Amino acid sequence: MSILEVNNVSKSFGGVKANVDISMSVDKGKIVGLIGPNGSGKTTLFNSIVGTYPIDQGSIKFNSKEVSELPVPVIAKLGLLRTFQQTRIYGKLNCIENMLISHKASDESLVKIFSKIPKNLTEKSENLLSFVGLYQKRKLRAGDLSFGQQKLLELAMALMNEPEMLLLDEPTAGINPTLINGIIDRLIKVNQDFGITLFVIEHYMRVIMQLAERIFCLAHGKLLANGTPEEIKNDKRVVDAYLGAQ
C-alpha cells in the first residue's frame, strides 16, 4: 500500500525546469532512496512534497489525501516531516529544550513551552535522545555538539512528533566517515522499531545501497530510473548520468 503518491508533478523557477512530469510512489513501512547528480531536482521534489514549494502541476497524495495545496504545518500534522542537509536546531538551547520546542512543531511561545513541562514529555525527550545516542549530552547546548551529533539531534526532534513518514535530505552529509555506519544503523532502527516510512536523498551510493529497498534516480529534473539497489547499480543510464555530471 502506498503512503506517498506523486503523479505528474512539475515545478519551475522562472525558465528553469526543476522537476518535469515526475511520478513515483512510496510503499508504507519501506525505506526508499532518491539519488541523482547535483541539480537533478531532488531537494526541489522534497520541498514540494512537504509543502514548501507550490507545484505548477500534478498531484501529491499522502495516505490518499491530496496535500499539494496544503501549507507545511498542516502537512506536518498529518504525519509527513522532513530533515535538512543543513541542520535546523536551536544552538543556544540544550538538547532537551530542542526536543521540547520541536514537539508538535510548537507554535506556542518559548515562555509558555518551558513554564510548565509535562513529565511525560521530558521522559519522551530523554528516551529519544537515548535512542540516538545523545542521552549523556542532553544538558549540553546544541551548538556545542559536533555536526554529526546535531544531525542525530535533528532526527530525534523529528521523532518527537511521531511522524508516519520522514523525508531525510542527505543524512550523512558532512559527517565523519567513521560515524556513517552508526547513522545507517539508527535509520534502519527508526524504520523497524517505530514503523516509520523513510524517503532518503543520499549522495553516497554505499549508504543508499545499504539503506534502501527501492531507489529512484532523477536527472535533469526528470525521473530517469527506479528499481532495487542491484538494478540501479547496473543501470547504464544511471551510471552515465553520474559520470556525465563529473
Locations of regions flagged by a protein language model:
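Catalytic Walker B motif of ABC-type/P-loop ATPase nucleotide-binding domains
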Residues: 166-170
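The feature captures the beta-strand-to-loop junction immediately N-terminal to the Walker
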Residues: 35-37
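Conserved ABC transporter NBD signature motif
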Residues: 58-66, 78
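Conserved catalytic motifs of ABC-family nucleotide-binding domains
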Residues: 162
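Conserved ABC ATPase "signature" region
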Residues: 112-137, 178, 185-188
